[in-house]
């Protein structure tokens, strides 16, 4: 599955992806939320029209990208992180992640998860899995409502 972080796969155009037989691309909720932004995607009526792609789109939750930032604060409600473009703080909740992926009109969406550094101890893994499960239930609830 080709990766199109911002919706566009680098170094290859969509005609070539079609010729190669790819039926889906992976895009990143976190990055698209920041640039070009939800307002742009919403005005254009979804990620498909923005990138002019007619096949499947899988969007991840953005959890790993937020985890990889040094300035993040993990809470039960979500993750507060410092935006690397502007320096402003943004709060990503499980519900917001799902809403964004619905705005993008993704075919396959992922729930927000807590990513932890490796190596780690069992206690940290246990806590991370339980938080991810808690968030997954919240994601499912909002997904089922929309």
What annotation goes with each model-predicted range?
Residues 1-144:
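Non-catalytic, usually N-terminal nucleic-acid engagement modules in DNA/RNA processing proteins
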């Amino acid at each position: 599955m080709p990766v199109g972080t911002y919706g566009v796969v680098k170094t290859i155009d969509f005609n070539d992806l079609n010729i190669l037989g790819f039926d889906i691309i992976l895009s990143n909720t976190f990055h698209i939320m920041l640039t070009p932004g939800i307002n742009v995607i919403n005005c254009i009526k979804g990620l498909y029209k923005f990138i002019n792609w007619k096949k499947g789109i899988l969007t991840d939750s953005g959890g790993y990208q937020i985890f990889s930032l040094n300035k993040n604060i993990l809470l039960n409600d979500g993750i507060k992180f410092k935006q690397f473009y502007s320096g402003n703080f943004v709060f990503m909740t499980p519900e917001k992640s799902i809403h964004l992926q619905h705005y993008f009109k993704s075919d396959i969406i992922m729930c927000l998860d807590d990513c932890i550094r490796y190596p780690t101890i069992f206690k940290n893994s246990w806590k991370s899995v339980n938080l991810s499960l808690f968030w997954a239930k919240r994601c499912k609830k909002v997904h089922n409502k929309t």
